[in-house]
Amino acid sequence: MTVKSAYQTLSVSRSGPVGWLVFNRPDAANAMDAVMLAELELAWQELDDDPAVRVIVNTGAGKAFQTGLDVVQLARQPEALREQSRRTKRAELKFTAWHNGVSKPVIAAVNGVCAGGGLHFVADADVVIASSAASFLDPHVSVGQVSAYETIGLARKMAFEPVMRMALAGRHERLSAQRAYDLGMVSQVVDPPEELREQAQALAESIADHEPAELARRKRVLWEALEMGLSASYRNAVNREMDAG
C-alpha cells in the first residue's frame, strides 16, 4: 500500500488501482472539524487526479464511519463555523466526492455508526457496502436542527417513506446494516465486520478492471438520469456515447 500526501484528519493511500480515503479522527467518532473539512476537498482532488487510481474507497478508522460536523470544535472557531454555515445556505458543500465532482467510481464502506452529516457520504457514493456492525441515523430534528440535505440525497437512491421516517423520528430511528440493505440504502452487508476492507478492496478491483473513461461515462449518465425524466435520460445517454466517439 502506498501512502499519499500527509493529512492531519484523513488517511489517504493507494493499494493497486484502488485509492483509500479514511476518516481518521476515531476519538471524535470521525466527526468533521475545520481541518477535516478543508482536507476532504484536497484529498478527493488528489485521488481523482492520480492516474494510478481507478476506484476510490471511503471508510472510517475505529468504530465509527462518520458522524457529521464536530459542532463543539467548530464552536471554538467562529470563522470556520460561519464559513461552513455560508456554504450550507448556498448549497456549496465541498466534502463528499459528489460535491467535488469526482469522476471515478466511489465506494462507501460503512464500518460503524453513520449519523447526521455522515449520511452525505452514503447518499453521494456510487456504491455503498456496510459491515454488520454499521448503523444509520439522522438526529438533526432531535437537536433542533433543520437540515434536510442528507435525506434529500438519500431519497434519490431509495424509497421515500423510510427516508422521511428517519428525518422525522431523529435519534429514535436507527437502521441496522441489514435493515439498510433491505431498504436499498446499501448493496452488501459484510459479516464478520473485520472483513469489510478486504471485501471493499475486492469489489473496487473488480470495478477497476474496466476502462476508466467508460466507467466515468457510465457513472455520469446514471447520476444525471436521477435529475431527468426517462426519455430525457435515454437521449442523454445516447449523446454521451456519441460524444465519446
Positions of the model-derived regions?
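CoA-thioester-processing core
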Residues: 94-103, 109, 115-168, 199, ...
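Amphipathic alpha-helical segments at domain termini/boundaries
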Residues: 1-20, 24, 167, 172-209, ...
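Glycine-rich phosphate-binding loop at the start of an alpha helix
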Residues: 68, 116, 148, 174-175
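Hydrophobic/aromatic residues within transmembrane alpha-helices
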Residues: 21, 58, 70, 121-123, ...
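Short, active-site-adjacent cap segments at secondary-structure transitions
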Residues: 63-67, 115, 137, 222-225
